[in-house]
Structures are given as C-alpha cells and as structure tokens.
Swiss-Prot record:
The keyword Secreted applies. GO terms for cellular component: extracellular region. The keyword NADP does not apply. It comes from Locusta migratoria. Keywords: Amidation, Neuropeptide, Pyrrolidone carboxylic acid, Secreted. It comes from the Eukaryota. This is Locustapyrokinin-2. GO terms for biological process: neuropeptide signaling pathway.
Length: 10
C-alpha cells in the first residue's frame, strides 16, 4: 500500500 493511512492526533 503506497498511500499512508491517516492517523488523527489528539
């Protein structure tokens, strides 16, 4: 998977 997964930062 080339597209990185979005990780929300709180």
């Amino acid at each position: 998977q080339s597209v990185p997964t979005f990780t929300p930062r709180l």
